Amino acid sequence: MKIIINTTNLRKGGAIQAASAILEDIKSIVNHEFHVFLSPSMFSNIRSLDFPEHIYIYKCKYPSKISLLNYDLNRLELSIKPDCVFSVFGPTYWNPISPHVMGFANGIHLYTDLPFYKKLNFYKKSKKII
């Protein structure tokens, strides 16, 4: 399979750490071809660009919030012809043509039994649900 891993919307913090861990993990998955789109922050965070030959690295700009202006990403996708696109976290501000899977990292929407959640007032809990 040809898989695009999209990190172009990631800027700092835990998202960068999670994406870096994914990049380390895919080094050992040699039966797929990975095309990794890196944000400027991700590119500067990578310790080494020494990746195996089944991983292709692209330094990209941060995507525009107007998805029609993301020509570079669209052009790359058309030339790669991936089987799917995996965006580490959303929102991506880019709508690929290929099937798209997007990660989700806001635990409060998943784990309402967290101690933090119990301390929220009714209004804030309602806002999180909506």
Please give the residue ranges for each predicted region.
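Short, glycine/charged-enriched secondary-structure capping and boundary segments
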Residues: 18-21, 49-53, 95-102, 115-118
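A short, glycine/small-residue-rich beta-strand->loop->alpha-helix junction that serves as a flexible
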Residues: 6-20
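Cofactor-binding loop segments of dinucleotide-utilizing enzymes, especially the Rossmann-like FAD-
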Residues: 8, 39-41, 105
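Active-site donor-binding segments of glycosyltransferases and PAPS-dependent sulfotransferases
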Residues: 4, 19, 29-91
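Short catalytic/ligand-binding loop motif for oxyanion handling, primarily in non-cytosolic enzymes
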Residues: 12-14, 43-46, 93-96, 109-112
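Acceptor-binding helix/loop patch of EC 2.4 sugar-transfer enzymes
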Residues: 101-129
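A basic- and aromatic-enriched beta-loop-alpha substructure that forms the phosphate/nucleotide-
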Residues: 87-93, 103-108
